[in-house]
Regions:
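Hydrophobic, aromatic-rich transmembrane alpha-helices
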Residues: 107, 279-317, 342
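Perimembrane helix-loop-helix junctions
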Residues: 5-6, 10-13, 193-231, 296-303, ...
């Protein structure tokens, strides 16, 4: 009798949709956290360090572009500045913020599915697919990059657009436009997503499904409200920088510099890399990609509005990925479209089975495929490898683990008033140590490449700032990827800096770049430090200003 009662209780649990739904959400969150756990402490890569440092500058009252230079849109810096209110300037702190921030994106995508008349199971399958895809090494989902950051306002913009149609609300249309603008002000390629959201809301509004439910006031009224939100936020961003006295710098580094940056990119030559990255993504996540593509093909074949909208969203996502150097983190922009397609596609596939028990078993099997295949293919990333080993695997020979050693030394041997100049692009040293740069040029390649007409002027400006600030420490990063000299630009700044260092500074520490992490070398005799690092190809050298200089 007890065994029969146990079976009845078990079946009652699986027949209760509320309990099943709650258990499914618990499973999704456990999988989401579990997939990210091993990568939470990966040393920050170059962009993360730069975003974090500029976030610190903002918190100290500074202004991006005027007080610290990068050529990304400003949104990401302010998001980092907000994150630093709660999270420490460490790899684990930044990546814990990403874990929570990205969880909001996951929930927003679930909301998009439900607002698009998807079932709870389609929403959960979308959430699971996004949990897996967004943590994937193929998209460098462990890094708090602009690509990962823009996904939340993108998902919220989609959800707001659907709410605007459902509620016949111009306020939600305005919010959708403003959120789409936020995507653009996090990464310029977000313009493809903004245009897509605008087109999708018009397409969905005209669909028979929504026409039968509730009419919007008019297509023109909705479009006007959406555009008003988009331009209101954009004008607010531009106006803010001009009011703060940084308008010219904002204009140059966001648009003029990026024009020259784009001239150094050849899309044709990046196609093999693009193709290889797409193949790797498909190989690692065959169930998700297959279900998403199947959903799109079926939707187009039967002229289903959701399938057509997913096709447009997927094309826009690819358009956002293509410009540039096809770096792996660019492909994070594909994850929402693929996750939505997988959620709807897997639901359609499993609903073809008539038996409820068989359908539940098929759903469980699909979920195992979604999660199990990528983990089985890359156990090292998800379970075995250390944080430093993962950093070297993805970014070698970049000295990202070694920057922690350098930052720790500087933090312990200086005060917050002391300034540091880094000949290289390793702003994470400044971020970890909480020290200010002696120059606003914390990114070096605008000074070392001839495609930028003002590179020589910027060298002079950097030199003027260095001599005026008299930094306590000068850090020289002997890694090509940190300097990106094109072999043609006049390295006048480097020569001036080395003469300056020879006269007034002494070598006090060095970190050789080694696997998985080079260790700090210190000695009172600088000659012995130089001797110890002589056999290493890549190094970080730390010079301190002499007390009599």
């Amino acid at each position: 009798m007890k065994r029969k009662n146990s079976k009845k209780t078990s079946w009652r649990f699986f027949s209760d949709p509320v309990l099943v739904h709650a258990a499914a959400w618990i499973a999704v969150w456990c999988i989401y956290v579990g997939l990210r756990f091993n990568s939470i402490s990966i040393p920050l890569e170059r962009d993360e360090g730069l975003f974090g440092y500029i976030g610190q500058v903002i918190r100290d009252g500074g202004l991006p572009y005027r007080d610290a230079i990068d050529h990304k849109p400003p949104g990401v810096y302010y998001i980092y500045a907000a994150a630093l209110l709660l999270f420490p300037p460490t790899p684990a702190g930044v990546h814990l913020f990403l874990l929570l921030y990205n969880a909001l994106t996951l929930m927003a995508l679930y909301g998009v599915v439900r607002l698009a008349r998807g079932s709870p199971s389609a929403g959960l399958l979308t959430a699971l697919s996004y949990a897996v895809l967004s943590s994937s090494p193929q998209v460098e989902g462990f890094a708090a990059s602009t690509e990962m950051i823009l996904l939340l306002p993108l998902a919220l913009s989609l959800a707001s657009a659907l709410l605007a149609i459902r509620w016949s609300s111009v306020v939600m249309a305005f919010a959708s436009g403003a959120l789409a603008a936020a995507v653009v002000w996090i990464k310029h390629t977000g313009i493809f997503f903004a245009l897509t959201v605008f087109c999708l809301q018009l397409a969905v509004q005209q669909s028979a499904d929504f026409q039968r439910s509730r009419q919007m006031r008019s297509s023109a009224g909705y479009a006007a409200a959406w555009l008003a939100g988009f331009f209101a936020l954009s004008l607010g961003v531009v106006g803010y920088f001009y009011i703060r006295g940084g308008g010219d710098d904002f204009l140059y580094w966001n648009f003029i510099f990026n024009y020259y940056y784009g001239t150094g990119q050849d899309i044709v030559s990046s196609l093999p890399k693009l193709s290889a990255s797409l193949r790797a993504l498909c190989t690692a996540h065959p169930v998700i990609v297959g279900a998403a593509l199947g959903c799109v093909v079926f939707g187009v074949a039967v002229r289903d509005v959701r399938g057509l909208c997913l096709l447009l969203f997927l094309v826009a996502s690819l358009a956002a990925v293509v410009p540039g150097y096809a770096y792996p983190h660019y492909f994070a922009q594909l994850t929402p479209a693929l996750a939505l397609g997988a959620g709807f596609g897997l639901e359609r596939f499993t609903n073809a089975v008539a038996s409820a028990r068989l359908r539940q078993g098929l759903i469980a099997l699909c979920c195992c495929g979604v999660c199990g295949v990528p983990v089985w293919q890359d156990v090292g990333y998800y379970v075995r490898s250390s944080s430093d080993e993962l950093s070297k695997r993805f970014f070698s020979p970049n000295p990202f683990p070694e920057t922690i050693e350098a930052a720790t030394y500087i933090a312990h041997n200086s005060t917050q008033r002391d300034k540091v100049f880094i000949f290289g692009s390793e702003a994470q040293i400044l971020f970890y140590s909480r020290r200010k740069s002696a120059s606003r040029f914390v990114l070096l390649y605008p000074l070392t490449r001839t495609i930028y007409p003002q590179h020589r002027l910027h060298q002079q400006q950097a030199w003027d700032e260095i001599t005026q600030s008299r930094p306590t420490y000068v850090v020289v990063v002997n890694v090509f990827q940190s300097v990106l000299w094109d072999g043609k630009a006049d390295l006048w700044l480097y020569r001036q800096l080395m003469d300056f260092v020879a006269q007034r500074y002494e070598l006090v520490a060095a970190v050789p770049v080694a696997y998985p992490r080079g260790r700090l070398i210190t000695h009172p005799d600088s000659n012995k430090i130089a001797k110890e690092i002589a056999d290493y190809k890549y190094t970080i050298k730390i010079f301190r200003r002499r007390y009599d200089a």
